[in-house]
Amino acid sequence: MESQQLSNYPNISHGSACASVTSKEVHTNQDPLDVSASKIQEYDKASTKANSQQTTTPASSAVPENLHHASPQPASVPPPQNGPYPQQCMMTQNQANPSGWSFYGHPSMIPYTPYQMSPMYFPPGPQSQFPQYPSSVGTPLSTPSPESGNTFTDSSSADSDMTSTKKYVRPPPMLTSPNDFPNWVKTYIKFLQNSNLGGIIPTVNGKPVRQITDDELTFLYNTFQIFAPSQFLPTWVKDILSVDYTDIMKILSKSIEKMQSDTQEANDIVTLANLQYNGSTPADAFETKVTNIIDRLNNNGIHINNKVACQLIMRGLSGEYKFLRYTRHRHLNMTVAELFLDIHAIYEEQQGSRNSKPNYRRNPSDEKNDSRSYTNTTKPKVIARNPQKTNNSKSKTARAHNVSTSNNSPSTDNDSISKSTTEPIQLNNKHDLHLRPETY
């Protein structure tokens, strides 16, 4: 086509075409303004003919490359290198296209072109039907949303094109500091889940539920590099991108591992602060539990010195171990190993005292026999006095009779009476008691 134009106008050469893009000056004696009207008309007809041929030429027709041809379009300046991201994959804000983010509910500020998305992410219908997000989207984490940008375009046709989880998916904020990356990646993972991409997020074991597609990987890479500028990435993230600038999945996997590690650290601190020990469990098991927690915290960057560790351990001691609080509390250089030596000593002493006690248990039949042969010596003996009263009353009557007759009887009778008084009186009762007269 261009060769045909040049053949129609032999006065125009390639040198004049190159002059439009090169700095070389073309010397000619002809005044460029001295052009006849007939020449101008011929130029107009030729340009009209060239435009008609250009419109009828199919877009897919291959044009042979001409090394000497210079395009009349101005040369495009490549975007600057953005840290670990490659220059050929970077996109500027001017390359934004709202249709590429319509299915995900992303605003029009996302810089990637439609050809990077597969048809499954490219919704049908005109682009103006899809909602636009306010200018507050993509702001830093600490920046509040302005009140003027809280309006959304409502469209009934967009309901079927949006995700089934939420009508509007809010993108993550812009990362503004390496220290904010742990919080930012949480919002980014939440954004992927709301965008129906939760299946590609690594699970606890580090593997996703399903395999990520090429289009999803492109989507992941483009959104990550826009909302996480390289100058604000942590060092460990830059190290991953320096090996493979598209390995966003590895960054997400490492981030999830760090989240779980942070949760474990919090659990270890709570466990160490709430220790309880009274000797009910072996001292070895208690020591292993405590030392593992301290070592795990130290490895994760949370240093627990001996003084703090001993104070936390002693605070949870009870029973016979409680006195260790007062015997060791003045030792500033006490270590955890020394404290556990004392705990082991008390535990072994408890176990030795328990083993020294007799375990023999007497037979219940022996206890029954002993109770039968047992005589209570402390309990006084009870004697029934009723039979004695009748006998005593008789003896008193007989004595009174003897006394009354002794005054009228001769002296021999008195001698017999006095003789009888010195002899014991026999009482006929079942107890066979022998009472002397003086007791009356």
UniProtKB/Swiss-Prot annotation:
Keyword presence, Phosphoprotein: yes
Chain positions covered by the region annotation Disordered: 1-88, 126-173, 352-440
Biased composition (Low complexity): 153-165, 402-418
Composition skew (Basic and acidic residues), residue ranges: 429-440
Compositionally biased residues, Polar residues: 1-23, 48-60, 127-152, 419-428
Modified residues (Phosphoserine): S416
Region entry RNA-binding, spans: 299-401
Subunit description: Homotrimer.
Entry's free-text remark on domains: The C-terminal RNA-binding region of CA is sufficient for all its nucleocapsid-like chaperone activities.
Note: Retrotransposons are mobile genetic entities that are able to replicate via an RNA intermediate and a reverse transcription step. In contrast to retroviruses, retrotransposons are non-infectious, lack an envelope and remain intracellular. Ty1 retrotransposons belong to the copia elements (pseudoviridae).
Name of the molecule in the record: Transposon Ty1-ML1 Gag polyprotein
